[in-house]
Amino acid sequence: MKSHGIVHKYGDNVDTDVIIPARYLNSSDPKELAKKCMEDIDKEFVNRVNLGDIMVANKNFGCGSSREHAPIAIKASGISCVIAETFARIFYRNAINIGLPIIECKEAARDIDAGNEVEIDFDSGIITNLTKGTSYQGQAFPEFMQKIMKADGLINYINEQLEAV
Amino acid sequence: MGMTMTQKILAAHANLPEVKAGQLIEANLDLVLANDITGPVAIHEIQRLKKKTVFDKDKIALVPDHFTPNKDIKSAEHCKCVREFAKEHDITNYFEIGEMGIEHALLPEKGLIVAGETCIGADSHTCTYGALGAFSTGVGSTDMGAGMITGKAWFKVPAAIKFILTGEPKEWVSGKDVILHIIGMIGVDGALYKSMEFVGAGIKNLTMDDRFTIANMAIEAGAKNGIFPVDDLTISYMKEHGAKPYTIYEADEDAEYEQIITINLSELEPTVAFPHLPENTKTVKEAGEVRIDQVVIGSCTNGRIGDLRIAAKVLEGRKVAKGMRAIVFPATQAIYLQAIEEGLIQTFIKAGCVVSTPTCGPCLGGHMGILAAGERAASTTNRNFVGRMGHVESEVYLCSPAVAAASAVTGKISEPSELFS
């Protein structure tokens, strides 16, 4: 599985309130949430983003509220993967559970710039920066999380477990 | 190798003799929580599951508290979705507004969570119950929905930071100042993926309300959970609130901690977190002249009776500054009633505050006290991110109830002692 797109770059501590502000949480429709994604930190994001694009950020991405609407909004906006130096733990779980690919890679997070063209190979964890001609080794997921992702999220994984019983 | 308090609770709930940091386990859950924002997403996910019956109708809590009383049609529909789910599955602990409260104040008050138990909640401040010596942590809707059906959740066993608390806090210094000080010290990702375990002789000088406040904001340092040892005060609290059987776990002598931090409570000062991160802390003395437009006293962090008593003590016989909007939110109906009986509500109203029904409203910028561009609030809530309480160009300063009340009187971030000298 690969993803390939243009980078939207952010800094440290991007919290779930700016990813999807609470005033929009009276909807749980992914399409509606996607229209408001990143509004409080990057008003132009929704106009700029194309299907397959990649989000890159520094430390502690997705901190704060546990709202699953945050990874849902990012995924529904067309983003194919989020690369960050570190993720807040609830966001990390939520992303895996809803099938939004995420990769922790300090080197990539620091070196990749906004607008760079990037390709990610999820099987090897290798991130290639086509603009700069550099590549970085992202962290591989534990086997258990890979199983959840292969099943395309926690719900399908649990269904598989229920069938096996 | 010994285990931390958190690791012991997780091992017991995973039916394992021991667990180690980094190990992936599946743990049995004693309580699963959702609210009106996260519930509908989970209920939608549950429809996709092959098993649709809940694991235990007595071990699920559904608390519509965020956009309630319903702020608009969409919120009303979300609440209706949760209400109908509760009815369909005969959920014992569903709380309509007349019997409700903000979830993290309500659940301990109702005795639904006690020492030694495990809880996941689709709300990041679920870590509050660590004050009772329980393992509780925030998750997303899918994890929570899966938990409601299976009664289990997977966890990566956390490493831990030990905080040794010594001494006694000065007058006007409370749990909020302690946790703001800690977050200022270690940063908003200082405890990322880890447990914050609080120990030491200073704990006996912290009320249960102080401990709830501290555990509540563990997430603001990125922690998986915050946890306190169980002492006589915890036991009497649990007995007063439902007397469910509990189990006391203690960390082993040789438990491993990634970091040990000692904090002398007597050295702490009233503290405030500047925009736009809870880690941007200064003492109130260092804050300088920060004019404010609105004060919010309440929330799952600071809306308990002890918090209201402190705020009333400051506001007694005083008036809020001209042009100040001061809003008080008792965290539950029971706390509201107690505040009426103790005369606290009269004090607030005479001082020129408004008093609201329990709701999460302003804390997350939902309703009931939204800020316009350029406005500033001093708030006893838990987050001050960009746009958290309203407009992206508004600002939130996090503080204790004592500092919030004093600031309401002076119109700027102030220490209560300024009013009592």
Curated annotation (Swiss-Prot), chain A:
InterPro entries: Aconitase/3IPM_dehydase_swvl (IPR015928), AconitaseA/IPMdHydase_ssu_swvl (IPR000573), IPMI_Swivel (IPR033940), LeuD (IPR050075), LeuD/DmdB_bac (IPR011824), LeuD_type2/HacB/DmdB (IPR011827). One of its GO terms (biological process) is L-leucine biosynthetic process. It comes from the Bacteria. Keywords: Amino-acid biosynthesis, Branched-chain amino acid biosynthesis, Leucine biosynthesis, Lyase. It catalyses: (2R,3S)-3-isopropylmalate = (2S)-2-isopropylmalate. Heterodimer of LeuC and LeuD. Belongs to the LeuD family. LeuD type 2 subfamily. This is 3-isopropylmalate dehydratase small subunit. It comes from Lachnoclostridium phytofermentans (strain ATCC 700394 / DSM 18823 / ISDg) (Clostridium phytofermentans).
UniProtKB/Swiss-Prot annotation, chain B:
Gene3D superfamilies: Aconitase, domain 3 (3.30.499.10). InterPro entries: Acnase/IPM_dHydase_lsu_aba_1/3 (IPR015931), Acoase/IPM_deHydtase_lsu_aba (IPR001030), Aconitase_4Fe-4S_BS (IPR018136), Aconitase_4Fe-4S_dom (IPR036008), HAcnase/IPMdehydase_lsu_prok (IPR011826), Homoacnase/IPMdehydase_lsu (IPR006251), IPM_dehydratase_rel_enz (IPR050067), IPMI_cat (IPR033941). Disulfide bonds: none annotated. Its cofactor is [4Fe-4S] cluster. It comes from the Bacteria. It is an enzyme of class 4 (lyase). CDD domains: IPMI (cd01583). Binds 1 [4Fe-4S] cluster per subunit. Its EC number is 4.2.1.33. Pathway: Amino-acid biosynthesis; L-leucine biosynthesis; L-leucine from 3-methyl-2-oxobutanoate: step 2/4. It catalyses: (2R,3S)-3-isopropylmalate = (2S)-2-isopropylmalate. GO terms for biological process: L-leucine biosynthetic process. GO terms for molecular function: 3-isopropylmalate dehydratase activity; 4 iron, 4 sulfur cluster binding; metal ion binding. [4Fe-4S] cluster binds at C300, C360, C363. Keywords: 4Fe-4S, Amino-acid biosynthesis, Branched-chain amino acid biosynthesis, Iron, Iron-sulfur, Leucine biosynthesis, Lyase, Metal-binding. Catalyzes the isomerization between 2-isopropylmalate and 3-isopropylmalate, via the formation of 2-isopropylmaleate. Heterodimer of LeuC and LeuD. This is 3-isopropylmalate dehydratase large subunit. It comes from Lachnoclostridium phytofermentans (strain ATCC 700394 / DSM 18823 / ISDg) (Clostridium phytofermentans).
